[in-house]
């Protein structure tokens, strides 16, 4: 490795430790549109009895379906249609809708809401079932996301991710905020606020905890944050840098990158703290670990071959088997992320002076760039594997973008008015 290349990789490792731009706090709006030319036409009638509610379930469902890029919303008019109504499916088919949704929101004596709906196939002239959900003023949005998930799965055969959550870091003035939001960027909550950088959020498989790196003690330390209770605790505070936490599929272990002995190497720690174990034994820089979904492998970035590339090793470490190089397209590849089905590898490749998001088929080895942006970083798969969230630059600002994982459409920038946002992580399916 040339001195310039080695310095470049060391700069990358350093940038993984301090990466947050100035920003004004704002709502993230997630949009994924323009996916191919086979969008499914669907009409969602206004749900009965929701006109005066704090959240309009119908609007949430329509917005979810539209931003997925997989559906076209057919105008359903303004007349509410409850799930109990007799529906002329032929008439809706004639209007261009291949599916129709009817529903209602009813307030119960205890102050909660009962949200009911039915999904119809207008082509086959039959019901595709529905759900009856209980919600409160604060969970009506979640009910809407769950309805959209049901529709997505019934019509496309793939589980929807509308009811999942995102995490990301926003900086306001001299304050950093780790925020948790719905998958559409709405309903954002501040999990942690600090005057020191917060980086590398990583969701637990259950979706109830987030591991991250905080500099609040003037050095990078790995914390775990329990979202329901707000409790947080340190899991790695070793000598030097503690970075890049990644959960094992069983939630019992975190892989981390530590500079405990000089060069950054990969270790594991118990998710409750303690149990430190070294996995790599190289004189190079080994960093950015990520578990395969079956828990058998850890993918990571290393410059052991002369330049940064993606490798994988047994989850027990190199003592159980030599690390194998995985990426061969391009001379500088970092930030491995494996799709939930274990078939795809997303990573960042230095290309033509920029950095692009690539996706590689792990069976064939074929790899392709799937973005038209040039400062990509921090990829994160959606729980169904159909989309990737990542950080990039647009108009001189740090932004988030989303793109179909098959590259079938250009990436869409996620709108954050007046500010910058970094460090995205897409949460798992909620239990």
Curated annotation (Swiss-Prot):
Top-level taxon in the UniProt lineage: Bacteria
Keywords of this entry: Cell cycle, Cell division, Periplasm, Signal
Signal peptide residue numbers: 1-26
Entries under Pfam families matching the protein: PD40, TolB_N
UniProt key word Acyltransferase: no
GO biological processes: cell division; protein import
Region Disordered, annotated ranges: 411-431
Membrane-spanning residues: none
Keyword Ribosomal protein: no
GO cellular component: periplasmic space
Subcellular location(s) per record: Periplasm
Function: Part of the Tol-Pal system, which plays a role in outer membrane invagination during cell division and is important for maintaining outer membrane integrity.
Family, as annotated: Belongs to the TolB family.
Subunit structure: The Tol-Pal system is composed of five core proteins: the inner membrane proteins TolA, TolQ and TolR, the periplasmic protein TolB and the outer membrane protein Pal. They form a network linking the inner and outer membranes and the peptidoglycan layer.
Protein name from the UniProt record: Tol-Pal system protein TolB
Species annotation: Burkholderia lata (strain ATCC 17760 / DSM 23089 / LMG 22485 / NCIMB 9086 / R18194 / 383)
Gene name, Swiss-Prot/TrEMBL: tolB
């Amino acid at each position: 490795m040339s001195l310039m290349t080695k310095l470049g990789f060391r700069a990358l490792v350093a940038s993984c430790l301090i990466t947050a731009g100035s920003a004004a706090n704002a709502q993230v709006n997630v949009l994924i549109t323009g996916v191919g030319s086979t969008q499914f036409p669907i009409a969602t009638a206004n749900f009965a009895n929701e006109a005066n509610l704090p959240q309009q379930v119908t609007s949430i469902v329509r917005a979810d379906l539209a931003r997925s890029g997989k559906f076209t919303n057919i105008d359903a008019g303004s007349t509410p249609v409850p799930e109990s109504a007799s529906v002329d499916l032929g008439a809706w088919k004639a209007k261009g809708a291949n599916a129709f949704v009817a529903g209602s929101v009813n307030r119960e004596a205890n102050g909660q809401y009962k949200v009911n709906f039915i999904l119809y196939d207008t082509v086959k002239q039959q019901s595709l079932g529905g759900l009856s959900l209980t919600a409160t003023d604060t969970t009506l949005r979640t009910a809407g996301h769950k309805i959209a998930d049901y529709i997505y799965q019934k019509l496309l055969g793939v589980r929807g991710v509308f009811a999942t959550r995102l995490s990301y870091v926003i900086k306001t003035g001299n304050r950093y905020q780790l925020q948790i939001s719905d998958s559409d960027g709405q309903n954002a909550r501040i999990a942690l606020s600090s005057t020191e950088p917060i980086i590398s959020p990583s969701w637990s498989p259950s979706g109830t905890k987030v591991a991250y790196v905080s500099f609040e003690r003037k050095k990078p330390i790995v914390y775990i944050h329990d979202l329901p209770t707000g409790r947080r605790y340190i899991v790695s505070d070793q000598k030097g840098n503690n970075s890049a936490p990644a959960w094992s599929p069983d939630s019992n272990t975190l892989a981390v990158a530590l500079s405990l002995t000089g060069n950054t190497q990969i270790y594991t720690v118990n998710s409750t703290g303690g149990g430190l174990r070294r996995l790599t034994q190289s004189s190079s820089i080994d960093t950015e670990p990520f578990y395969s979904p079956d828990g058998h492998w850890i993918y990571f970035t290393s410059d052991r071959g002369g330049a940064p590339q993606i490798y994988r090793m047994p989850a027990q470490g190199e003592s159980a088997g030599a690390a194998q190089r995985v990426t061969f397209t391009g001379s500088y590849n970092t930030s491995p992320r494996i799709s939930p089905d274990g078939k795809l590898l997303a990573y960042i490749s230095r290309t033509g002076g920029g950095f692009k998001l690539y996706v590689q088929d792990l069976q064939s080895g074929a790899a392709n760039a799937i973005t038209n942006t040039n400062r990509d970083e921090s990829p994160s798969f959606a729980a169904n594997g159909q989309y990737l969230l990542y950080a990039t630059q647009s108009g001189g600002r740090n932004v988030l973008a989303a793109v179909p994982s098959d590259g079938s459409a250009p990436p869409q920038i996620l709108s954050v008015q007046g500010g910058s946002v970094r460090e995205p992580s897409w949460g798992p399916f909620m239990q």
